[in-house]
């Protein structure tokens, strides 16, 4: 079924593999117009969001993603992203807060995550353990949040993260406050790369002088708690790695 094939591949992979179209390596994985279109005025559009309050979204559940220093590409520096998941199946995700942790020791990075658990009703923490400080941060975080999930980045898993995020953007299911301008830069820094074997994967491009791709990967590690295909039944990940 052609629709199933499209769901299982990014638009560029579909064009490259099934339509015999050439896809240029190094292009941004996410359309700038789509990214800008996901931005909203949080103060007007999110009545439950009080960013300077002790509990910015009250008791609403949130999912947190953490991207470790340097592990998801060549230009990352580590970041945490806080996302409010939809309250109903198929609803919208909202990135309500982000923080970059560049220059912090792994104990301090884990402390940043712990501080978020004091301010938010955290249901999920996805942690990149591929490299950098990730494994050490995970070992600390699981002491105060035993349900934290470690994710190992591979060619396939990064593709899954990007596919999920593209799906959310296409369906209008992801929003961020326009004040979070670095998020646009972060997602625009995620580039498609073709391996020697012809497999398309994704990395952050440091050669272009961008070091904020970490915010994008952290956001994707939060939203992937709703796996591809799980948007209609509220299904969430229960596996420890992917």
Task: Tell where the protein language model's regions lie, with residue ranges.
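RNase H-like, metal-dependent nuclease domains and their acidic two-metal-ion catalytic environment used
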Residues: 1-155, 159, 163, 173-242
